[in-house]
């Protein structure tokens, strides 16, 4: 994941900062507790494609 891209993209739900999870290949919005997938290295920033983070994931 290109770190320059992380500086300019935002959560499509709340416009908050996204964090890259290398082990799960997801972009994480901590404010909304959502994880957006990467497909072939491309972020899929659609609310319908996001998964809800578990309580454990939200607090890590």
UniProtKB/Swiss-Prot annotation:
Sequence similarity: Belongs to the UPF0434 family.
Name this polypeptide is given: UPF0434 protein KPK_3615
Disulfide bonds: none
Cross-referenced PANTHER family: PROTEIN PREY, MITOCHONDRIAL (PTHR33505:SF4), ZGC:162634 (PTHR33505)
GO CC entries: cytosol
Record organism: Klebsiella pneumoniae (strain 342)
InterPro entries: Trm112-like (IPR005651)
Pfam family of the protein (one): Trm112p
Record-linked HAMAP family: UPF0434
